[in-house]
Amino acid sequence: MPHGLITIRRGRRTDLPALAPLLAFPPTHDTDKKHTQHWRRLVSDPAHDFYVAEQHGTLHGMVLVSYVRTLVHLGWLAILNIAVEPLAPGDISHRLIDFAKARARKRGCQRLVVYVSGSEPQMALTPLLEAGFLRMGEVLSCSLQGRP
């Protein structure tokens, strides 16, 4: 889905080397193999939507939306994971979040949640809060009902 100079496209297995610095992978051979296997499973799993933000051939961020059924919420619940390069153009975070919301709505989800550990810098949470997420302890939650 093009957005001016920024393109949001489905992630590929070959994107791992470019995105690994965003995920802070330790550089050991054993973990590289495990991360590669994990990555390939994520990219090919139909229970996930994995997309990257690309600008002029450079990957600046990624979003993974996982879909689960829960006892509390009727239907599906969408769980968001997002990572954006700190020096990426300012609107990439917002575009990835909006894109994730649209994908989750398309799958029939009524809520999108993000789990936070408390160690995230405030600037990493700011785009989520600006996008309508509300903090409840270690969870940021956003209703997908109403306006897109």
Q: Positions of the model-derived regions?
A:
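Helix-loop element at the rim of GNAT/NAT acetyltransferase active sites that forms part
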Residues: 21-33
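Active-site rim helix/loop that mediates acceptor-substrate recognition in acyltransferases
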Residues: 31-50
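Conserved catalytic-core motifs of GNAT/GCN5-like acyltransferases
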Residues: 115-117, 129, 134-147
